[in-house]
Amino acid sequence: MIDVNNFEYMKIGLASPDKIRSWSYGEVKKPETINYRTLKPEKDGLFCERIFGPQKDWECHCGKYKRVRYKGVVCDRCGVEVTRAKVRRERMGHIELAAPVSHIWYFKGIPSRMGLVLDMSPRALEEVIYFASYVVTESGDTPLDKKQLLSEKEYRAYRDRYGNTFQAAMGAEAIKKLLQDIDLDKEVDFLKEELKTAQGQRRTRAIKRLEVLESFRNSGNKPSWMILDVLPVIPPELRPMVQLDGGRFATSDLNDLYRRVINRNNRLKRLLDLGAPSIIVQNEKRMLQEAVDALIDNGRRGRPVTGPGNRPLKSLSHMLKGKQGRFRQNLLGKRVDYSGRSVIVVGPNLKMYQCGLPKEMALELFKPFVMKELVEKGLAHNIKSAKRKIERVQPEVWDVLESVIKEHPVLLNRAPTLHRLGIQAFEPTLVEGRAIRLHPLVCTAYNADFDGDQMAVHVPLSSEAQAEARLLMLAAQNILNPKDGKPVVTPSQDMVLGNYYLTLERAGAIGEGMVFKDTNEALLAYQNGYVHLHTRIAVPASSVNNNETFTEEQKGKLLLTTVGKLIFNEILPKSFPYINEPTKSNLEKETPAKYFVDKGANIKEVIASREEVAPFNKKILGNIIAEVFKRFKITETSRMLDRMKDLGFKYSTKAGITVGVADILVLGEKDEILHEAQAKVDKVIKQFRRGLITEEERYDRVISIWSNAKDVIQGKLMKSLDKRNPIFMMSDSGARGNASNFTQLAGMRGLMANPSGRIIELPIKSSFREGLTVLEYFISTHGARKGLADTALKTADSGYLTRRLVDVAQDVIVREDDCGTDRGLLIGAIKEGNEVIESLYDRLVGRFARKTVKHPETGEVLIRENELITEDIARAIENAGVETVHIRSAFTCNTRHGVCKKCYGRNLATGTDVEVGEAVGIIAAQSIGEPGTQLTMRTFHTGGVAGDDITQGLPRIQEIFEARNPKGQAVISEIDGVVVTINDVKDRQEVVVQGAVETRTYAIPYGARLKVTPGQEISHGQELTEGSIDPKELLKVTDITAVQEYLLREVQKVYRMQGVEIGDKHVEVMVRQMLRKVRVIDAGDTDVLPGTLLDIHQFTDANVKVLLEGKQPATARPVLLGITKASLETDSFLSAASFQETTRVLTDAAIKGKRDELLGLKENVIIGKLVPAGTGMNRYRKVDLVKTVQDDTNVENDEIYVEQ
């Protein structure tokens, strides 16, 4: 018996008639389903119990044998085997067809496989198969050619003239005869010869034919199997018939389609027995052919067969296709038990690793565990009474539940799960009510808020699953975001505001300049009203919580600080610097010396002479968390986060910051600014009327005048604002809102865009505080409506992008420690003009150096090759003035089906080296797809024609990853050389580039802006005009490296412009997947076929083999595939079929007899194996446990953090 859960590969092929018969348990002869009186299946019908097995467990059709003791007996009255009813899901039947029919996938698919094998056009095939023309199968000694088509008239004429010396036939029988006559070896050799000379159309046709014929030859499939003599009937439980309440029956469409086939087949048999006229028989055969077509793929040819209400019936192909098909609905997405969902509410008193689970929900989810425990504790005698106790909710059940859920993590998931932080594990605590309580800090990761969001709970059952949930998925472990390595659990909103308020300073506050002996005394004074949180005071430096970074000399001095900052620093680890000002040096090194004062000094004077120090905003809090994480790892960080959260909530409550209409102060000088702007606009309009400037220049100038006016107002507003204005505090702290919201409230709303995205030159001069006029309000509605429509579209687009990205990279897994490559990537800062988009430091951190880097001046070694570049080293490299560094990169990694640890570098989510088995492809896809919803949808419209619209945001990302021809394409140079002249020709310009060997002339399209000047030296692949380069063009004129770098740079540009940071390595993984195929140009002496797409590794393997034999290697050129195309070209047919174009992928795979080696994640999910990543990898599965001596360690019970 084969082990269903453990096999090495999966193969697909064409089924021969004998194979179909061997699967079958009997022939279905009648179209009947069930008897309408007895409701029992009819004998020999589509639900026959003799063929498919009994309907009830261990019971035959006539009832002679009942009970399990007759297992395996075949009833002598009704012929039904006594067995489980489950076999009705696996036993197949068959229909013996009275005439062969063609399989529509192979005849109708594009390209038509049958047509390629026979070298006939699909049109001709259709005429033969559907009985419109005869085809010559044997020409004999007549002037006819084999495979020649004859009409009815011609056929009769030739029959009269030549008698029976030639043979011609119609229908699938004729095609079958032709397919059987093919000598594959002969055809293949003939085509290979032809390829040496053929050109153009003939060559492409020959390549296509060769590919199909080679597939047949190598796979052992026979071409004649594309014609069916026997039709398999799938098991009845997979096409069920169920009784509805009203006594009517609902049935699967397949039964209708099968019934049509059986009816026509039986009628054809009868006609043949009667010896009916050929024209009637032909018509019946055609109808049989159409019935089988409809069963296999309804609607592929002609009009689909419809059921009641003109609804097309769902055929076998439709069962596989699309979101509702077998692949995506049942194999890749299953419903799971031990799960529940409920509304979420905030749980501010939870610890980082906890969540609140409603009592009734927990009881239902942990039922089996509670039952077992009840029996073990002797509270119930057996499982049945334990179950009864739970159903009656008796009081002792709750105590048992408490002990069961202790230490048993549960998973919380919020849809849409855009990245892996959308599912995290928590320790449950029981809460009253029916809502799940969620820790406020994990909301960012889930993108959750409490306006009615719901979340699902799942229970990990096995001890391995629990261990994984606790060690890898616990919320306290997931502090960093996998996309950029920055903390994702930063406080937000109230928490930020509270900590901001806590660390404010106010000159002249009550009790300024008082000196206290320690923190406690200062707090006492605060509680009794002698000082305020914002009061600047002094305490002995040695008395504060985290004084370990102070020098001995500093410890003898007084530390100038505020009461609030004393409280804030209490939450930090002892060896962390005392944070007194929001600067990088204070965070990373130590408290600045200016805050230490000798004990005898006049404290009040010293304080009065100082400026107020800025409070800590959201960004600083984020930096503090990152720094604590870097030094103290997980346990300490999550403790500190909880304390920071508590402080934030406590002091935002104390602060009582509110917003009232009186807080919005309208700017006094606004009218003057607007008058000035209006005067400038009038002047521009005058110039335009006199014909001094064009319409376009006028428009641009007007827009810029109003934009400047708005900026001036914004600047003055921000200056005039009181630093303690509640709205200002909210925006300054990063809790809510920004400067632009402010300007709209108190300054002016500014310019708006119309529905097409063009800016309307009439500005909205009012602010919300003053109120808008009717026209202004109307103009504003455009933007508001477009915003809402965009958001809805964007979500769907972004989700689809993520799906394609996941699909193309799902098999990229870290497979080994070092691939030993000698290649690398030369990187520098990414710039757009003079603006740095991504600094060298950002690109270096967490990567391995490919070559040793030395200081340009001193020559000291900054980093050796193959060593990890840490934050400090990266900073040193940048400070040394090094511009470019050679690093290891996923682009140049030699590992098959994945990457190696060295080329990938550090795992951003943990801040440590990446582990073997990490599914970096999926993480990359999630990291690029998840921020997709934050990107804009807009294409910027610069008024008029010139400088075509530049695509930005999400559409641009799709354009890059799908390798489409970009909008507003730039012209690039194909050679190195010098720009000699730029000529004006008619209505366009021409750029002449002179190289060492040849001179090229490039026509510049109308309206494009030039980027080069005469006399400038340029290199191949360089842009001559502004715009986006077409990466396919770039690949033709340069090499792979240039294309990889270009794509990486462009993706980073789009995301960084929108303020989204993504690690380079994620983009590298995706781009690598787009460039892993080559197209063979010349096969040399290898077995590969010219014109085919091959994986780079397959190609090099084939070449290595012939080179060792001293023969001619093949040549190929790299191909850039868009992600959709790349997913469909993957080696795994299961993965490709479950992605898109299911029928096409399966048709192709069957003919080639493809083997799926099950290397990716999707394939394994589909067949129900563990995914070969993480702990599912073979190297982690075959682990033996060795019992070691238990070392005596005292573990505090209430802290369950796990160090990584």
UniProtKB/Swiss-Prot annotation:
| Chain residues that bind Zn(2+) 2 | C819, C893, C900, C903
CC terms in the record's Gene Ontology section: DNA-directed RNA polymerase complex
Gene3D superfamilies per UniProt: 1.10.132.30, 1.10.150.390, 1.10.1790.20, 1.10.40.90, 2.40.40.20, 2.40.50.100, RNA polymerase II, clamp domain, RNA polymerase Rpb1, domain 3
Keywords assigned: DNA-directed RNA polymerase, Magnesium, Metal-binding, Nucleotidyltransferase, Transcription, Transferase, Zinc
Query: What single Pfam family name could you report for this chain, choosing any that match?
Result: RNA_pol_Rpb1_2
The note describing how and how many cofactors are bound reads: Binds 1 Mg(2+) ion per subunit. Binds 2 Zn(2+) ions per subunit.
Which GO molecular function annotations are given, in alphabetical order?
A: DNA binding; DNA-directed RNA polymerase activity; magnesium ion binding; zinc ion binding
Positions binding Mg(2+) in this chain are D449, D451, D453
Q: Which cofactor does it need?
A: Mg(2+); Zn(2+)
Instruction: Reply yes or no: does the keyword NADP apply.
Output: no
Provide a GO biological process annotation. DNA-templated transcription
Q: What is its EC number?
A: 2.7.7.6
Source superkingdom? Bacteria
In which residues is Zn(2+) 1 bound?
C60, C62, C75, C78
Q: Which reaction does it catalyse?
A: RNA(n) + a ribonucleoside 5'-triphosphate = RNA(n+1) + diphosphate
- What is the role of this chain? DNA-dependent RNA polymerase catalyzes the transcription of DNA into RNA using the four ribonucleoside triphosphates as substrates.
Entry similarity comment: Belongs to the RNA polymerase beta' chain family.
The record ties this protein, via HAMAP family, to:
RNApol_bact_RpoC (MF_01322)
How does it associate, per the subunit comment?
The RNAP catalytic core consists of 2 alpha, 1 beta, 1 beta' and 1 omega subunit. When a sigma factor is associated with the core the holoenzyme is formed, which can initiate transcription.
Q: What's the protein called, per UniProt? A: DNA-directed RNA polymerase subunit beta'
UniProt source species: Bacillus cytotoxicus (strain DSM 22905 / CIP 110041 / 391-98 / NVH 391-98)
Q: Name the gene that codes for it.
A: rpoC
